[in-house]
Amino acid sequence: MSRSGAIIIGLFFIASIFDVFRAEKEPPAEDSRLEDYLSSELETTAIPTVVNENSHSQDVVDSGFSKDLPKLTILYCVSCGYKQAFNQFYEFAKEKYPGLVIEGGNFSPDFWKGCLAQIVGVAKIGLIAIVITGSNPFEYIGFGYPQILQTAHYNRFSYSLLVFMIGNLFESTLSSTGAFEIFLGDKQIWSKISKERVPTQEEFLNLIDLQLKTIR
């Protein structure tokens, strides 16, 4: 059980790490469920949308003006699953402003939460190693062989998986900020933390339009 359990856990970790990196490298894509959510958030007092009256579609900014556009930055909560939301807003902005430089990244949690999340991650790996290898570090500091550790050694696979899941839960909770903060140049034009919701497509594009009018 010890050898086979170690192999299974090792494969489980490798698969988890692979999924994380693969998720980060996914190209922008549409998500119908997110689109439904954004549509449901539309307020009746939303900022008027800039629309081409003849074709009833949004105007595209002339490429000659694109070089003067400030950089659009979107900082979002990765652990909250907002990567897909960023991809969708990226497409919204690129469709209207082809020359707009857009950057996205994780909105870091408070310093102490980030440090605590790292400590939890290290502790998680250490506990899993102790369970899988069957070692007893408590013996070296005079605490003998705790009953819970004995039980974990007899059920290595299930206890390793339990530690992994609980550790991930605490790490995710500490790392989550719920943020989706949008900046145009050095000006913040939207904050999900303060407004407690993601902007609609119309609000997003109109906020960019209004901000550009102030700098032209």
From Swiss-Prot:
The gene coding this protein: selt-1.2
Domain of life: Eukaryota
Keywords, in A-Z order: Cell projection, Cytoplasm, Disulfide bond, NADP, Oxidoreductase, Redox-active center, Signal
Catalysis: reaction(s): [thioredoxin]-dithiol + NADP(+) = [thioredoxin]-disulfide + NADPH + H(+)
Family that this chain belongs to: Belongs to the SelWTH family. SELT subfamily.
Function, in words: Probably has thioredoxin reductase-like oxidoreductase activity.
Cellular component terms (Gene Ontology): axon; dendrite; endoplasmic reticulum membrane; perikaryon
Subcellular location per the Swiss-Prot or TrEMBL entry: Cytoplasm; Perikaryon; Cell projection, Dendrite; Cell projection, Axon
EC nos: 1.8.1.9
Expression by tissue: Exclusively expressed in AWB chemosensory amphid neurons.
Stored Gene3D superfamilies: Glutaredoxin (3.40.30.10)
Position of the signal peptide: 1-23
Free-text disruption phenotype from the record: Viable with normal development, anatomy, motility, lifespan and brood size. Double knockouts with selt-1.1 are also viable with no visible phenotype.
Stored Pfam families: Rdx
Keyword Oxidoreductase: yes
InterPro entries: Selenoprotein_Rdx-typ, Selenoprotein_T, Thioredoxin-like_sf
SS bond partners: 77-80
Record GO terms (molecular function): thioredoxin-disulfide reductase (NADPH) activity
One GO BP annotation of this record: cell redox homeostasis
Protein name: Thioredoxin reductase-like selenoprotein T homolog selt-1.2
